[in-house]
């Protein structure tokens, strides 16, 4: 397995579309997310509105993204998330929506209740946002970097994503992103928020 959610229900994801989940910590359920049972999933997040069902989002290789509902110790059938991009069409002076051409990997995903938004990050600075806990579509955003983004978290009213080459970018809504100074060129592989500060780890002991 390559990743596990940071809150209940605890869901681990990995190669061959496998996942395992538990709420109690003692009984684990095992299944497959789908996508031909061939995809490696690299990240997983848990989201809830405080009043509705708890949802799980898994992201992985080849632009794979899927969502399911957690019910007790079980996970419902996984629903693939469609990827879209919006482009300005000068001839008609409006923005139109198209199917995304992104085929790279996703590495991390996070949900933030106050923003009502999932944020997924991946190769070549790719960021996709999904507004609404149960939405079935994700839209690409401009990150301002071409570095692969390896992880994302939320804290202090900001989404923070980290990646290769010391890349750190931030957004207060998941849509508009700006660079942060990291003072390193080492690849940054993960980030957490402990309620008081962000902690980032990376290559070469960073």
Question: PLM features: what roles do these ranges have?
Answer:
Residues 1-206:
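Residue-level hotspots at or immediately adjacent to binding/recognition sites across diverse folds
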């Amino acid at each position: 397995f390559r990743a596990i959610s940071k809150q209940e229900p605890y869901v681990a994801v990995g190669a061959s579309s496998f996942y395992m989940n538990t709420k109690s910590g003692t009984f684990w359920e095992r299944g497959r997310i789908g996508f031909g049972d061939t995809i490696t999933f690299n990240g997983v997040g848990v989201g809830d509105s405080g009043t509705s069902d708890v949802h799980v989002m898994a992201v992985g290789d080849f632009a794979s993204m899927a969502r399911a509902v957690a019910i007790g110790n079980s996970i419902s059938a996984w629903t693939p998330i469609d990827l879209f991009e919006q482009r300005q069409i000068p001839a008609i002076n409006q923005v139109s929506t198209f199917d995304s051409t992104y085929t790279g990997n996703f590495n991390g995903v996070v949900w933030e209740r106050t923003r009502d938004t999932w944020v997924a990050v991946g190769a070549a600075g790719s960021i996709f946002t999904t507004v609404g806990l149960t939405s079935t579509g994700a839209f690409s955003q401009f990150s301002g970097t071409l570095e692969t983004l390896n992880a994302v978290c939320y804290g202090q009213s900001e989404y923070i994503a980290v990646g290769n080459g010391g890349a750190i970018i931030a957004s207060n809504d998941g849509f508009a992103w700006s660079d942060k100074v990291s003072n390193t060129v080492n690849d940054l592989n993960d980030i957490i928020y402990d309620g008081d500060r962000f902690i980032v780890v990376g290559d070469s002991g960073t």
